[in-house]
């Protein structure tokens, strides 16, 4: 089968291999069969390995949904009664956690920092000291809206010193840059299959401390479908999801994980890094600037400032690139006009070099006409 290859420079879903795409073409199977349950058990264990977890302590719980379902699940499931959430917020995707808290009516503090900077650890420390009822601290590892990489190891240490559970959204970092759930002081991390693993959309997962999941059994029940303990318990008792899983998507995730381990994480990390460097090289050649300090960037997403040109039109540039096989994406900084270029997915330096050849021509054809 000849599948046209598209280069996705958006922050997910990412460009995938044909073998992952074709892994979805399998004989029909009832997801309650032991064969399928066995595959999901191995998948869960392998996801823990991706996060460098300890299988005697950590587990992975699968859910059907986009990555945002994980935020919903962790916040509504892991907060005890009469306790509070602290959201360490320096970006648009972290703000989703604030919105989840608002929708559930969860007591919370939205600790806002500039989207251009790292969170101030001393302010986090003081906030926890002043609010002993905070039981859960939440932030994002890689804030995809800007490309900034947050100091989760340091934040986790502070959270634990105050007896709080530390939950981190690793949707746009897990499997692409170094992460160790234990060494990074993280109790729960989360991701979706279509980003770092380069699988298909529709399957998400939470990796975390089993003892903390079991403790949450007696917490207030705020959701039926999106309850972490309920899904975990059903997996432990039956090997199955509580409700119908995305069967073909699970097969694609299995193939993607096989490819992840075959390549090896160090080689995969190195590829993402050289793609990121190629993006910066291309931006420099075009004279385009980025919004976040280079030393704070994740190595995966670059927020690019619009050029100082009244003729610049992002929509036209997007469409021009899209017609030539490349997808670029709008920025998420409300105060500044930006677009994003990402080093996610099954792409390499040659793809980026071809993209910037297109960008050089778009400057001539669209911007300067």
Model-identified regions with their sequence ranges:
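Active-site phosphate-binding strand-loop segment of PLP-dependent enzymes
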Residues: 119-175, 188
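Conserved N-terminal alpha-helix of the aminotransferase class I/II PLP-enzyme fold
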Residues: 23-73, 92, 96-100
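N-terminal "arm"/small-domain region of PLP-dependent enzymes with the aminotransferase-like
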Residues: 1-34
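Conserved PLP-binding catalytic core of the aspartate aminotransferase-like
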Residues: 289-320
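PLP-dependent enzyme catalytic core of the Aspartate aminotransferase-like
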Residues: 1, 338-369
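Conserved active-site segment immediately N-terminal to the catalytic lysine
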Residues: 182-194
């Amino acid at each position: 089968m000849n599948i046209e290859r598209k280069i996705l420079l958006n922050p997910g879903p990412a460009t995938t291999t044909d073998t992952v795409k074709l892994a979805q073409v399998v004989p029909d199977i009832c997801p309650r069969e032991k064969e399928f349950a066995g595959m999901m058990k191995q998948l869960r264990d392998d996801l823990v390995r991706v996060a460098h977890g300890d299988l005697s302590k950590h587990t992975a719980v699968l859910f059907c949904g986009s990555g945002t379902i994980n935020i919903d699940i962790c916040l509504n499931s892991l907060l005890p009664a009469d306790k509070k959430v602290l959201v360490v917020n320096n970006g648009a995707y972290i703000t989703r956690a604030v919105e989840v808290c608002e929708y559930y009516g969860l007591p919370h503090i939205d600790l806002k920092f500039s989207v251009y900077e790292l969170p101030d650890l001393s302010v986090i420390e003081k906030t926890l000291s002043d609010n002993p009822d905070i039981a859960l601290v939440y932030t994002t590892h890689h804030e995809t809206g800007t490309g900034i990489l947050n100091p989760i190891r340091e934040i986790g240490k502070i959270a634990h010193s105050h007896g709080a559970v530390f939950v981190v959204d690793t949707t746009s970092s897990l499997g692409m840059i170094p992460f160790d759930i234990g060494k990074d002081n993280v109790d729960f991390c989360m991701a979706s299959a279509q980003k770092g693993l380069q699988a298909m959309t529709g399957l998400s997962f939470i990796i975390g401390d089993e003892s903390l999941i079991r403790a949450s059994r007696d917490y207030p029940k705020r959701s039926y479908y999106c309850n972490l303990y309920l899904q975990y318990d059903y997996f432990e008792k039956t090997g199955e999801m509580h409700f119908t899983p995305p069967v073909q998507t699970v097969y694609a995730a299995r193939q993607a994980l096989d490819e992840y381990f075959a390549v090896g994480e160090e080689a995969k990390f190195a590829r993402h890094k050289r793609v990121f460097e190629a993006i910066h090289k291309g931006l420099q050649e075009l004279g385009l600037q980025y919004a976040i300090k280079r030393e704070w960037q994740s190595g995966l997403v670059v927020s690019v400032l619009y050029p100082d040109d009244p003729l610049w039109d992002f929509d036209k540039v997007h469409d021009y690139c899209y017609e030539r096989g490349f997808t670029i994406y709008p920025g998420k900084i409300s105060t500044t006009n930006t677009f994003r270029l990402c080093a996610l997915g099954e792409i390499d330096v040659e793809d980026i070099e071809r993209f910037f050849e297109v960008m050089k021509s778009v400057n001539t054809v669209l911007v300067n006409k």
